[in-house]
Amino acid sequence: TLLTDTSINTDAAAWSYQSEKETADAIDILWNILKSRHQIPSSKVHIVMSSGLMQELDKYKKVEYFANVIRPVSLDPSIKITYITPEQEAQLSLLGIVPQKRRFTATQIDVGSGNTKGGYFDANKKFVPVTFPLGTKSFQRLIESKTAGDLSEYVKTADAIWRDSLRNTVINEFVVKQDVRNRDIMYISGGIVWAIASLMRPESCNNNYTELTAQEISEFRRMLFTDYDKLIKPDLSFIKVPEQERACQKNINRVLKTYDRKALLAGAIWFDDLVQEINTVNPNKKL
């Protein structure tokens, strides 16, 4: 049972002293909430690094180092900081996000900071994972490693990376795992999805599920480049309940604090191109 949502967003994958300290401080805060407010025993506490973060750290053999450096002094020594694989995270995401009535008929895709993962259950109810070692922040780093130019060059570089390499990687994955394209409903999640829903459908801030269209994802991508100021300041005057309007504005502020313009662009370009490739077979797929 989820007792409360106390999520704290830190840029753990930045690998700076500041991001490491912020992550350690966040763990310390959450551990004290569990221990003091909810009296949850140490044996029931699990601290798990996301698969995307683990993949990035593993490239430099820093998984163990990172687990140690983000461990707050106050944390019970019996609590381990572990990690999860992309395949494990994909299956757990589907089980946690997709309603039970659609568990065996829908697909699910989660666009994380370091990777993108998802999948579906096949006719034999066996989970088929779909994973790509690229997410919002890792794609941003890849783009920035190839250009130091202005925003226009940034977008051109991102488009070239998709065209020259990423598209073939995606196509090869979907040739084998065809139900990602064929099924009628796909549940989407992750930071960039949260950002799109928050800015394109701000009134949905308190909803568990929000239906988006492929056109809205493409429009979000366009506005990031050509109409950024309008995008980040959506009109909330149509929300008639003051408390809801304040909650939606607070949600937008969280998005903008978490992601800068280039991070949003990287995530939007990757996600938009991915969705367009998925929709080549079934363009009316519900998202």
Task: Mark where each language-model region is.
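A short acidic Gly-Thr/Ser loop motif
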Residues: 1, 108-116, 123, 189-192
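Extracytoplasmic
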Residues: 3-5, 102-104, 113
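Short amphipathic alpha-helices and their capping/turn segments at secondary-structure boundaries
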Residues: 1, 34-36, 120-122, 174-180
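N-terminal glycine/serine-rich phosphate-binding loop of ATP-dependent small-molecule kinases
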Residues: 1-51, 72-77
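A cross-taxonomic marker for long C-terminal extensions/tails that follow the last structured domain
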Residues: 116-132
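Helical "lid/coupling" subdomains associated with nucleotide-phosphate turnover
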Residues: 13-28, 55-66, 71-105, 128-129, ...
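Short glycine/serine/threonine-rich phosphate/pyrophosphate-binding segments
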Residues: 1, 91-94, 113-117, 271
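Structural motif
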Residues: 44-46, 107, 185
